[in-house]
Structures are given as C-alpha cells and as structure tokens.
Curated annotation (Swiss-Prot):
Gene it is expressed from: rplN
Native source organism of the sequence: Sulfurovum sp. (strain NBC37-1)
Domain of life: Bacteria
Entry protein name: Large ribosomal subunit protein uL14
Function, in words: Binds to 23S rRNA. Forms part of two intersubunit bridges in the 70S ribosome.
InterPro entries: Ribosomal_uL14, Ribosomal_uL14_bac-type, Ribosomal_uL14_CS, Ribosomal_uL14_sf
Length: 122
C-alpha cells in the first residue's frame, strides 16, 4: 500500500537506490498503489555514475509491498520491503537487471519485460 511521500527501494540497476512516491497514477482521487500500479516518484538516493540522477522525477512500477496482497485463490503474499522498478514512457524498464523477487501481479498488469528480467516471480 503505497501513497504520497512513501519511500521505496529501487529493484533495478538504473542508478537510483531510493525513490519517494509523489503521485499514484490512475484517477484524480486515487490514494493508494499496490503491486503492478504505476506511480510518479522523485529520486532521493542515486549512484553518481547511474543513468538516473538524484532529484529527477520518474515513473515507476511497484513490484513488492510490505502490505499483504490477497490473491484470487485466497492466499496472502507479502514481502520484506517496498520496491519499484523505474520505467520509461513506453512502459519498458530503464535498467537491464532486476534485483530480488517480483510479484506475479506485475505480470497481470502487463509488464512482461520486468517479469522476464526478474530472477524470481512469486
């Protein structure tokens, strides 16, 4: 459950290490984002040699949340951290590697490139 001012780890090698959610996309009054949702975020911590610099406003897809997600079969899944992958305007990831597990809901949201790069899909 991600909302404005929530800080997320970045799960790719784009150069950013931590981002802060500015806005949840998908409606003017939408407050929370879950796995598979797109957010607008500001880069708070970044590597100096990375593609994405500190202070840049980016779009990102939430791939892991600490708040549990209920699946269709009734099972619950949750992760140890809140994490996102930075994407471009064509919904393709900027980085070439994804770190850590990615939720299956990312596949249902249509981000197949992220799922194929992920080492593990839960």
């Amino acid at each position: 459950m991600i909302q404005g001012f929530t800080r997320l780890n970045v799960a790719d090698n784009s150069g950013a290490k931590e981002i802060m959610c500015i806005k949840v996309l998908g409606g003017s009054k939408r407050r929370y984002a879950s796995v598979g949702d797109v957010i607008v975020a500001s880069v708070k911590k970044a590597l100096p040699t990375g593609k994405v610099k500190k202070g840049k406003v980016v779009k990102a897809v939430v791939v892991r949340t600490k708040k549990e997600i209920q699946r269709e079969n009734g099972s619950l899944i949750r992760f140890d951290d809140n994490a996102a992958v930075i994407i471009d305007d064509k919904k393709e990831p900027i980085g070439t590697r994804i770190f850590g597990p990615v939720s299956r809901e990312t596949r249902y949201a249509g981000f197949m490139k992220i799922v194929s790069l992920a080492p593990e899909v839960w």
